[in-house]
C-alpha cells in the first residue's frame, strides 16, 4: 500500500501556540554554548523596543586617580598651591548596532502527500539548533572585526597571544595550560576574570588526546577519557570549554606556514545581547501554489563591553568588507585600554590539522 498524507497535526498547527515559541527560545539557549556558559548575557539596557537602528549607552571609564601628598603649608599638591586638584572621570558611550535577520522555509501539499511526513515539522525540530548556529556565526564575525588579522590590527588586537609556529610546530605551539597563562597575563591582574575558552574541534582533540580535558559534574571534576560529550560540561585550565567548528582557520597566513586557529578566552558576560524584537515564528498558506510557509525573524545585537560600533550605517552583515561586522574599521575602543576588556584571542597550531596556507 502506498503511503499518503492522511492529515493530522502539522507544525503549522503548533507554530502559533506560545508554548512552541517558548520551547524554541529555551532550546536556543540550550543549544548555544556561548549562552549556556554565560559568555553571552541578556542586558535590557541594550534593548531597542521603542525603535531605532542602534543603541547608545553612556558610561564612565575605569578611574586611575593620581595620589597627592598632603603636607602642612601652602605649596603641596600637584597644584603647588596647597590644595587637592579635581581630576576628571572619562565619560564616553558604547554603541551597539541592531541586526535584522530572518529566513523562510516552504513545502507544498504534494511533498506532504508523497512522503507521508510534514517537511516543516522536520524544520521545526532543528530550528533551535539552526538559529543558535547562525547567531554564533554572527558573534564570530564580530570578534574577527574586533581583533583583526593575524597581526592583530583590530581595536582588541593588543589582547592577542600568537604562539603558533611557522612551517613546523611542537607542543609549545599548541593549546596548553602554559599558553593559557600567557593569554590571562595579557590582562594582568584581571586575568582571573576569564571564565570560558572557545575553540575548533581540531584544537580540542589535542586536549582530549593528552588528557587535559576535564568533565565538570555537579561540582566535581573527572578526567575526560570518554570524549567531549560527557555528562556536564568540559573544562580546561579552570575554564569552561566551548567547541564550535565555526572557529576555523584564520585567513591571511603566510604561504607554506601551518594553519593557525583562533581561540577566544572570555570573561563572564563580556558579550551582552540587546533585543529589538524577540524571535518570531509565523506560518502562512499560499493557496494558489498549495504551499505552507514557515517564517522566522529576529532583531537583536551583540555588544562586547568596552567597545563600540563605529561604522556610519547599521544592520551590517557578517562579511569583512567596509561597514560590516568583520571589518576592523567598523569598531572602536570605548575603554581607554584594551586590557580592561576581559576578552583575549590566542592563535595556535594543532597536530590534528597539518595543512598549510596556500
Question: Language-model segments: what does each one mean?
Answer:
Residues 63, 203-204:
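Acidic glycine-/aspartate-rich tracts in secreted/extracellular proteins
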Residues 107-189, 318-320, 324, 332-351, ...:
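Alpha-helical scaffold segments that mediate packing/assembly in large oligomeric complexes
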Residues 35-101:
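Assembly/oligomerization interface modules of large self-assembling protein complexes
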Residues 2, 57-60, 110, 357:
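Long, position-biased, composition-driven segments near the start of the mature protein
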Residues 2-40, 162-178, 209-358:
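Sequence/fold signature of self-assembling virion shell proteins
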Residues 45-46, 184-188, 229-231, 282-283:
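A generic local secondary-structure boundary/capping motif
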Residues 57, 90-152, 188-201, 241, ...:
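Long, contiguous amphipathic alpha-helices that act as assembly "spine/axial" helices in icosahedral shell
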Residues 81-83, 87-90, 121-122, 129-132, ...:
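Glycine-rich loops and low-complexity Gly/Arg-rich segments
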Amino acid at each position: 500500500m502506498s503511503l499518503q498524507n492522511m492529515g493530522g497535526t502539522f507544525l503549522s498547527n503548533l507554530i502559533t501556540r506560545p508554548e512552541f515559541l517558548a520551547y524554541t527560545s529555551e532550546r536556543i539557549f540550550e543549544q548555544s554554548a556561548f549562552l549556556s556558559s554565560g559568555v553571552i548575557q541578556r542586558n535590557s539596557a541594550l534593548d531597542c523596543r521603542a525603535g531605532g537602528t542602534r543603541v547608545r549607552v553612556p558610561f564612565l571609564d575605569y578611574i586611575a586617580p593620581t595620589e597627592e601628598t598632603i603636607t602642612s603649608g601652602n605649596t603641596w599638591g600637584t597644584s603647588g598651591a596647597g590644595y587637592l586638584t579635581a581630576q576628571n572621570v572619562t565619560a564616553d558611550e558604547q554603541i551597539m548596532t541592531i541586526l535584522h535577520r530572518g529566513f523562510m522555509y516552504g513545502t507544498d501539499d504534494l511533498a506532504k502527500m508523497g512522503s507521508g511526513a510534514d517537511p516543516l515539522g522536520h524544520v521545526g525540530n532543528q530550528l533551535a539548533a539552526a538559529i543558535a548556529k547562525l547567531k554564533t556565526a554572527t558573534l564570530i564575525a564580530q570578534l574577527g572585526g574586533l581583533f583583526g588579522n593575524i597581526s592583530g590590527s583590530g581595536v582588541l588586537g593588543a589582547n592577542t597571544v600568537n604562539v603558533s609556529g611557522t612551517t613546523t610546530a611542537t607542543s609549545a605551539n599548541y593549546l596548553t595550560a602554559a599558553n593559557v597563562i600567557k593569554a590571562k597575563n595579557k590582562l594582568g591582574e584581571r586575568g582571573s576574570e576569564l571564565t570560558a575558552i572557545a575553540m575548533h574541534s581540531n584544537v580540542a582533540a589535542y586536549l582530549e588526546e593528552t588528557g587535559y580535558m576535564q568533565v565538570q559534574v555537579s561540582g566535581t571534576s573527572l578526567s575526560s577519557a570518554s570524549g567531549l560529550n560527557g555528562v556536564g560540561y568540559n573544562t580546561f585550565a579552570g575554564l569552561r570549554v566551548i567547541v564550535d567548528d565555526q572557529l576555523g582557520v584564520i585567513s591571511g597566513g603566510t604561504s607554506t606556514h601551518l594553519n593557525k586557529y583562533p581561540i577566544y578566552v572570555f570573561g563572564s558576560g563580556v558579550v551582552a545581547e540587546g533585543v529589538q524584537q524577540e524571535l518570531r515564528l509565523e506560518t502562512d498558506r499560499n493557496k494558489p501554489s498549495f504551499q505552507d510557509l514557515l517564517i522566522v525573524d529576529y532583531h537583536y545585537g551583540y555588544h562586547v563591553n568596552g567597545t563600540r560600533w563605529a561604522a556610519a550605517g547599521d544592520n551590517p552583515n557578517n562579511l569583512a568588507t567596509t561597514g560590516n561586522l568583520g571589518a576592523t574599521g567598523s569598531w572602536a575602543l570605548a575603554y581607554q585600554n584594551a586590557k580592561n576588556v576581559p576578552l583575549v584571542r590566542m592563535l595556535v597550531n594543532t597536530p590534528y590539522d597539518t595543512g598549510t596556507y596556500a
